[in-house]
């Protein structure tokens, strides 16, 4: 009975090759749409956005998780490029920095037209698939990029923003971030302020995906209950597998299922294993858990490549996606489930967001109250009349009367 023992390693190798071959076969027909990649930030950090610097050539770019050969090897067919500006730009130059990073994405697509197709719709993604190009979309990572302005939000939409992450790792005046749940930030909005609710409604009206990565649990729940369309978590994993507050807890996963929304799993080691080291199999554990709790329709990929310092063994860069798909097939995921995670789930959610939009509806116009705006370097134009300025004028009046009150008290 042991006469064939020497064949076992060969059988294992052949089985591994089978799953890898199957992964490539599936991905040729259904390439992956990744929800979050920070290559634009690397282009700023390494080259100050000088894309014509010979070192910035994306066909030979070194030292990053992402370049054109790696995208091709990984069967990446769609990418939300992250337009990110750090939290320390809030109330300073966040809007300018955001515009510059959007410009980088546009220029990158124009410089490599044989590889990238800039798109703003689900139909555009499908067109890129047909042309064998990487559908390139813009996701703005952090609500501080709109500077608490509905007008800025609409302008960013016109420039191509197709998802907005409501916060990064800092509160905005209208939404709370995930550090509230760790105790490292104080809650300001109890999820969403009234102005934050208007932001959600305006994103729905425009047909912009709402991204709940980085937000507090209260903000997750408030948005899932308010939004008229499904939402995404562009780069978040499962809290029950790794208890990082950047991940999505099971009660929220159940809301994701109820709203037909989407969790695109982040590959950062500390959100996968809760340690500095992780591996591909542990990423698959997160995908399994989300599928179990929220359903196969709720699963996607948001690797956070080039935005994190540590990625799992076996997922060293964007070229490794076929190995992750092979692992899911090894775990008895069906071809339909795999295709859903690769692209179909994101396309379904995006199409639902587009269908829920209503550009003929009047836009949200009520600005944020002046006393809720942060930062000292602001003018008050437009607040000189109406309720918002009334509180300010009363405050100035009371301040001017303070010396008189003090004098009277001394009489």
From Swiss-Prot:
Residues 386-411 form a propeptide. It is a lipid-anchor; GPI-anchor. Substrate binds at residues 168, 246, 304. Zn(2+) 2 binds at residues 141, 214, 235. InterPro entries: Dipep_AS, Metal_Hydrolase, Pept_M19. One of its GO terms (molecular function) is metalloexopeptidase activity. It catalyses: an L-aminoacyl-L-amino acid + H2O = 2 an L-alpha-amino acid; leukotriene D4 + H2O = leukotriene E4 + glycine; a beta-lactam + H2O = a substituted beta-amino acid; L-cystine-bis-glycine + 2 H2O = L-cystine + 2 glycine. It is found in: Apical cell membrane; Cell projection, Microvillus membrane. Belongs to the metallo-dependent hydrolases superfamily. Peptidase M19 family. This is Dipeptidase 1. It comes from Homo sapiens (Human).
